[in-house]
Amino acid sequence: MIRWLHISDLHLNDGNFSSARLRDELPSFLKDKRMKCDYVFCTGDIRSANVRPNSFTEDMANYMRNICHAVGAPMERLFIVPGNHDVNIFAEGREDAIKHILPYDGYYKPDYGHIDTVDLEKLQSGKEDFVGFLSEFYDTDRVGLYKDCNNPHFSIETPDFNVLHVDTTLVYSQSGKATDLLVGLEKLYTVVRKLNQEKPTILLTHYPITSLLQEERRLLSNVLQMNNVRLWLAGHEHDHNLQKMKYLDSLQAGELHYETDANATILIGEYDSENYQCRVCAYTWMGRVSNY
């Protein structure tokens, strides 16, 4: 049995009393329940961009190490994608590039899926701090995958899965809208078509598929189906959620941050490679009455 931990929306620099508690209690809970995991998946928002200070810190890197240690997963089995809060939306040239790309007034057409290289470079500038954070615990080759502005999406093949990293924050803009996003299908397809079809694929990203531009979503859904991608792991909405979209199971973890109208939730997934069965359990922090 292969097991993974899925966490999301940590917002580690936003530390109210209950948020600090639930984060501190998570490693102990995982150890006490002997939740050994082979992988840890983090679907973004390590920090809160709208809280000052909002820089990535060594304490944040140490928290990721503590989580991996609690479930017995080595750091190279930690897989992360950026969330919208991890991106500097005010990076020079980024907003202009987004306006140039978006299909309402820009050149992007989902049927072609093309984003100009010069615009990809400007979009990448918003991830410099995030990439610096990853360098605290990843080796140079791993960090290099996130630095490659010409290839914003990539896959890492493990002994058990293809872990397909998809950057759905690519054109997240200063407007804050998250219903007309796009991924650049041309670049994504170059990765998807090379997936090892002998292994299951886990797609890791920040936003649910419903956040994409309608035509982008339709075309991507078809590509995923044709290439046997069945599991979409995301976050963003600060609540655990399962959306069944035909062949695709879209699972969202909750947050590791306390809010009145949201759920601080982690997901534990299990996959039996012999009978191809998968099970996912949600654990929610109930701080007023108990632990997780």
Features from the language model and the residues they span:
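Short, solvent-exposed aromatic-acidic interface loops
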Residues: 204, 280-291
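Active-site-proximal segments of metal-dependent phosphoesterases and phosphodiesterases across multiple
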Residues: 169-231
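Beta-strand-turn-beta hairpins that frame and shape the catalytic cleft
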Residues: 1-5, 151-165, 200, 244-249
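Conserved beta-sheet core of the metallophosphoesterase superfamily
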Residues: 117-120, 212-281
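N-terminal active-site segment of His-dependent metallophosphoesterases
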Residues: 1-59, 63, 67-78, 88-89, ...
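Extended active-site neighborhood of metal-dependent phosphoesterases/phosphodiesterases
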Residues: 59-178
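Active-site environment of divalent metal-dependent phosphoester hydrolases
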Residues: 11-16, 47-51, 81-95, 173-174, ...
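Active-site neighborhood of phospho(di)ester-bond hydrolases with catalytic His/Asp-centered motifs
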Residues: 6-8, 38-45, 73-84, 166, ...
